[in-house]
Amino acid sequence: MMLERARFLDAADPLREFRERFMLPDGVIYLDGNSLGCLPKATPARLEKVVREEWGRDLIRSWNTAGWIDLPARVGAKIAPLIGARPHEVIACDSTSVNLFKLISAALAMQPGRKVVLSEPGNFPTDLYMIDGLERQGLAERRLTERGRLIEALDDSVALLMLTHTHYKTGETFDMAELTRAAHDAGALVLWDLSHSGGALPVDLDGCAADFAVGCGYKYFNGGPGAPAYAFVAEKHLEAARQPLTGWMGHAAPFAFSDDYEAAPGIEKLLCGTPPILGLAALEVGVDLIAEIGIDRLYAKSQALSEFFRQCLSERNVAIDLVSPTDPARRGSQLSFRHQDAYAICQALIARGVIGDFRAPNVMCFGMAPLYLRYADIVWVAKVLAEVLDSEEWRDPCFQTPAEVT
C-alpha cells in the first residue's frame, strides 16, 4: 500500500528531475544530507575548468580574467536571497567556526558595558567553544539557559544572543522573529547559526531584523566536504561592525600593500586570507541548484518526505522514540530518533545501503534532502529500519566499535 502511494507521489513530484543532476552511488539511499550533501554532476566539470583552464592555462591572470577575486562576494550574493538577506549583506568565506569568532567578537565590541553571550546547553559545540575562547581572553562571559527560558534570561548584561536556528540533533527550529525581537527589546544583539537551515527551509533574516548570521556550505548547499561557509551582517551594522581577524583580503585596498590596516567599507571586511577558489567554485554550483528550484518548493517536499516517513514507520509498527517535534512547522529537514544503541543501528543500516547520521550519545538523524530523495526510497528505509530493529542484527560486534568519525 505504501509503495503504491510512493510511486504515485514520485510520479507527481515536481522536483523529480533534479535527482538526475546528482552523482548517486548504486545500492545506496542517502539520508545524511544534513551532514554532507551529495555531489552535483556539474561540480566535477566546473572544478576541471577551474583547474585546467583558469589555473593551468591562465595562471595568476585568472584573479582578474576569471573573476576569482569576486568569488566570495558573488557566491555570498547568491546565498543572500535564500536566507532572506540582501546581496551586499552576505559573503562566502572561511569556516563556520571562524566566522562565529569574527561575528561574536564584532558584536561584543559594539556593546560596551555588556559581556554576556547567551546561548543554550546542547547548542552545536563549535558555537559554545567560540564563546569559551573569547571568555578565556576576558572578552566574553558565557551563559547557558534552557531554550524555554531564554527570553526571561535576557537582562541588561547580555550583549549577544547566539543560537542555532535548527538544532543539529533534534531538528527543532527556533522562532527567529520572536527571539530576535525579545533580544532587541533587552538591548542585545542576535547571531543566528543557519548551518542546518540554510538551503533547507525558509529563513528571513532581514524580515526578522537579525543582526548577524553564519552558515555552512557543505550540508544542504552541496558544496562538498569542507566547503566555505558564509556570514551575514545586517546593513545597519556594516559600518560599525569590526572583526578581529584583520587579514589582508579584508583591507579596503589589499593591493596597495599598506603597513596599516583599514577595513573594507562593506561586507568584504569579513574576509581574512586569500579565498579558497576551488571550494568557492564547487559551492557556487550547489547554490545555483538551490536557487533554481527555490527554498519554498524544497521545504515543502522535505516536510512531505518527513511525514511520509513517519507514516511508513507507523504502518510497520516501528516503536522508536522520535525526538524531533511532531509539528512540521517546528522542525527543519530531518527526523531524529533516540535509541540507546543508535550508533550500532546506524552501522547496521549502512551495511544494508541506508546511510543516516549518528549524533552522540544516542540519536539517529535522517536528513530529508528533497533534491535527490524519492518517496520510494523512504518506503525502503522504513522496511530496512524495521528489519534491523526486529532482528537485532545491530548487536553484531562488527557494528559496536565507533569509528574516528561517527
Description of each model-found segment:
Residues M1-T406:
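Pyridoxal 5′-phosphate
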